[in-house]
UniProtKB/Swiss-Prot annotation:
It comes from Aspergillus oryzae (strain ATCC 42149 / RIB 40). Residues 43-100 form a coiled coil. InterPro entries: Get1 (IPR028945), Get1_fungi (IPR027538), Helix_hairpin_bin_sf (IPR029012). HAMAP family: Get1. It is found in: Endoplasmic reticulum membrane. One of its GO terms (biological process) is tail-anchored membrane protein insertion into ER membrane. Belongs to the WRB/GET1 family. Keywords: Coiled coil, Endoplasmic reticulum, Membrane, Transmembrane, Transmembrane helix, Transport. Interacts with get3. The gene is get1. It is a multi-pass membrane protein. GO terms for molecular function: protein-membrane adaptor activity. Pfam families: CHD5. This is Protein get1.
Length: 196
């Protein structure tokens, strides 16, 4: 099992990745993956896209047919189009309700697996030292701050380690991003031309 040091560190890496990628992006990706599974929801989504294509084809055919010259054909296309649109709207309502329920479930699972786990670890290990500091290395008042609120004196508390990990992850990510952007930017090359 991972030690408490690494558990908290990897938790903050996961929180940073979720915050950087964006919750809505992750939700959309999970929804698309969910629609690939063999469920009734994915069947409804396929049926909805089929009905949408059919409605667009019927609308195109209606626009290509003259309502005055070929009224019978146009009226038949209009009835089929209206029926297809009604079916499409019913499926769309169903899928919208299922997607909102799915988004709510994913949001709860994401919160529980990131921030909820962080709060749980802070509560559960509040009296447990993450690691001990060497004797007489630092003054008493600094030891008190590092062990705040409930860890034994001379150790680092979970709360302080959480703050250190969050700061370290965000600063490291900023450094890596700036180095990547600096190396990815093309350097201007001066070209000299001879003048005569």
């Amino acid at each position: 099992m991972l030690s408490l040091i690494w558990t908290i560190f990897f938790l903050h890496v996961a929180i940073y990745v979720v915050n950087t990628a964006g919750a809505s992006t992750i939700d959309s990706l999970l929804w698309l993956l969910y629609l690939k599974l063999p469920t009734s929801t994915s069947k409804n989504a396929r049926e909805q896209s089929r009905l949408k294509r059919e409605a667009l084809e019927l609308k195109r055919d209606m626009n290509n047919t003259s309502s005055q010259d070929e009224f019978a054909k146009w009226a038949k296309l209009r009835r089929r189009h209206d029926k297809t649109m009604d079916e499409y709207e019913q499926l769309n309502k169903t899928l919208t309700a299922q997607k909102s329920s799915f988004d709510w479930s994913v949001k709860i699972a994401r919160w529980l697996s990131t921030n909820g786990l962080k709060i749980f670890l802070q509560f559960w290990y509040s009296k447990t030292p993450v690691f001990a500091l060497p004797e007489a290395w630092i003054p008493y008042y600094v030891q008190w701050i590092l062990s705040f609120p409930r860890a034994p004196m001379g150790s680092v508390s979970v709360h302080v380690w959480n703050s250190v990990c969050a700061t370290a992850v965000s600063v490291t990510a900023e450094m890596v991003t700036s180095m990547f952007l600096q190396t990815a930017r093309p350097t201007p090359v001066a070209t000299a031309q001879k003048t005569q």
